């Protein structure tokens, strides 16, 4: 008779892994035990079916569980007469992998809809297959006493389920019921409304066109009826958010199919237990008010992921709600009841609960480009799942702090990187405070208590750079600056385990190694270094950030043609006087920086075509340009010129203006401009790949959320015999910069 020890690592805590092992061993008549050893689960087996156990183990895992490594060894038999689950210990001191928050499972959903079930209409129903994890944990090991559920002692019925190995709630730390768990209440301003069904009250008020703040699993949403134009506009007014698209939540997939196009991969993602927001194209039956996603051809959509969401739909007759984060753009979501109840200037009512959110976590956002997944924001449902470093690196610990906007941080230990949830814009003090708190929380969860280096952006004035030096003093370690687009590139390279490549890096801004503003770059990169090979033509930015907010100023600078710009005089607040002042500013060089940003060029095209002349949110002008281009019916050729590896964008923009003033179709010009820029950058990349003897060309940066630009680069590069890669597990935008920083820093520590 055989005897073996099996050690498994991965997402094996708080996911029903030990009960699964228990059931599998019992099914195969095996004796022994299973127990947690910190970051490892140990399985001791005796019997004749051990090989069958090993074969079935990874194939029948619980929904949330994931095995990253499994080691087996023969051991001496001890003569066990049963199989048991024994008490955990901290024998291993490695990093425990805590699972992310997972959408309610079918079994729990069935219970809250069954009038005969004791959890009927209970909005916090959960089991080992679903529910909150990351948002409720304070420290490891993952036991109820170290979560926000510790405030809710189990009743006798729940305790019985908790202690039964064959029950799906066995050691489910988030389980509860209406007798022992959290409760919901509804308020109008500071006054509680007495009701035994506060969710029904909320559904009724939403039907009346009211705005409701709803505290959820990882934060708070502001919610209105998505079909109610008046309510949507009122929400915009109160938030001072005039144009940025609102995400929506629909009750089921059939509802989504009524207004959006869905591919098989999009369906699989939007219905997965991670339940991200997926950016979908509007279909011909789209019938929401224009105020919901103004000027865009797509809309962010998610399905319900908590019991409360399902109950909200069940109690009303609206199939789609606006669900937008209750925060100022770039600042952290509100998570405390005190904050939420002080929203009475924005929300009419507040639906809150008494379970603490220990780790706030925004909704994840995903966009597909021809069935290739791209994270816009990797957060709820994914954080804190780690990334593997696909290179030979040391075992030193690195904390990487990201750039300044759309920040995440990352902690690297051994060959793994533990990314944070979405943090936001650290030029806001509240967000910087949240970041510091989140770092402390992640240190407790991962048990990474010290760092050998702190990685950050090269920009000397970023708050994250200053924070890096604070941590450097605390841990008595070095600060390693990593160039912005190099970090982008290595995050992409790690997706594929590629050692070297040519990279097209396109975004709004990144601090260059020459202290200029980069953003349209052709780089040769490896994991330790990079070389700048080419870029977009550099242009002056009159007024610095003013040129970002008002892209008509950038257009003036790029085309540098008084006759062409004169047609746009009405877009300048002070008319011809302002135009003359800007030209004078460009001549003197006062408050004028140079940029090679692709984002600024696309914004200028948008301004030239009178699509968007004032930016009210990040990426607005470029996104609206893409949406206008989406409806193009005819191909227009715009010639481009490359000299010394620099793409001449002045002539491209001048041609855009000429075509528009000749009366060519706006959508066709927009489409042509995007594709011309993509072809020009691809041509520079191809020529340099040939010189360097490199056969892989990658695309990174926020511009590559643009489907037309990405597809054009891919087609052009592959037609020329090179391999084209794009982000598949990481953000194309700034959300992955910390990941790249961490990898570069670890290699430099070698």
Q: Predicted segments — roles?
A:
Residues 457, 475-488, 695-700, 707, ...:
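Conserved phosphate-binding/catalytic loops in two-lobed NTP-binding clefts
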Residues 60, 161, 316-392, 590, ...:
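Internal gly/pro-rich beta-alpha loop/helix module
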Residues 173-174, 181-183, 403-441, 466, ...:
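A contiguous, well-structured pocket-lining segment that forms one wall/lid of small-molecule binding clefts
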Residues 74, 219-282:
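A phosphate-binding glycine/aspartate-rich beta-alpha loop in the early core of alpha/beta enzymes
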Residues 485-506, 510-512, 550-560, 603, ...:
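Glycine-rich phosphate-binding/hydrolytic loop that grips phosphoryl groups
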Residues 213, 448-461, 692-703:
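Short glycine-rich phosphate-binding loop at a beta-alpha junction
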Residues 1-174, 178, 185:
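Intrinsically disordered, low-complexity, mixed-charge
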Residues 257-262, 311, 333-340, 364, ...:
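Conserved phosphate-binding catalytic cores of ATP/NTP-utilizing and phosphoryl-transfer enzymes
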